[in-house]
Each structure stands twice: as C-alpha cells, then as structure tokens.
Amino acid sequence: MELGLSWVFLVAILEGVQCEVQLVESGGGLVQPGGSLRLSCAASGFTFSSYWMSWVRQAPGKGLEWVANIKQDGSEKYYVDSVKGRFTISRDNAKNSLYLQMNSLRAEDTAVYYCAR
C-alpha cells in the first residue's frame, strides 16, 4: 500500500512540473494578401535554449501542419516548401523567445499559428 501511494505522489509531482511549461503566442492580426506579420512566442517553465523549437499552423477545417523549426543555437532552420523564401524563423535565447517573420502573405496562409517545443 505504501508503494502505491508513493507512485501516485510521484505522478502528481511530475504532472505539476509539466503544467508549468508555457508557450504564449502574440502578433497575429488581419492583413491583406502580400502583407507581412511577425509572430512572437514567449516561453517559460523550461530551459528554452536546450530545445529545437517549431511553428505549426492549423487552417480552418484542416489538421495541424508543421511550418518551420530551428535548432537550439539558431544554426539550422527548416521550412515547409510552401513558405520557403517568405517566412523566416528566428529565436532569442536570452529572451526565451521564438519568432516567425511572415512576408508576402497569401490567402492560404490563413490559420491559427502555434509555437511548439
């Protein structure tokens, strides 16, 4: 019985730690085709500089689509073909922040954008 209670307690602690991770996106808005937007993501609750980070998006009525990701030190970046040459992912480890500069926006870029660890 003691072992069972200890296990439940350990699970509760681990879940509590996981819940502290926060990724808060900002910078979205309405823009005409051809326009630009810069998205930001403020990270907390984990060592930001230790992780690859990504942007994903979900267009209305569709599933999640990976957009771009960036290595811990920013030295490697990858993009889905549809945004290459238009979107730029970047990060500032000193500010625990991730960015997505979106230029030459198209109607098909309409989506909810999320940052992901």
UniProtKB/Swiss-Prot annotation:
Disulfide bridge positions per record: C41-C115
Ranges for region Complementarity-determining-2: 70-77
Region of interest: Framework-2: 53-69
Residues covered by region (Complementarity-determining-1): 45-52
Subcellular location: Secreted; Cell membrane
Main location: secreted
Protein's GO biological process: immune response; immunoglobulin mediated immune response
GO terms assigned for molecular function: antigen binding
GO cellular component: blood microparticle; extracellular exosome; extracellular region; immunoglobulin complex; plasma membrane
InterPro entries xref list: Ig-like_dom, Ig-like_dom_sf, Ig-like_fold, Ig_V-set, IgHV
Domain Ig-like as annotated: residue spans: 20-117
Subunit relationships: Immunoglobulins are composed of two identical heavy chains and two identical light chains; disulfide-linked.
Protein name as annotated: Immunoglobulin heavy variable 3-7
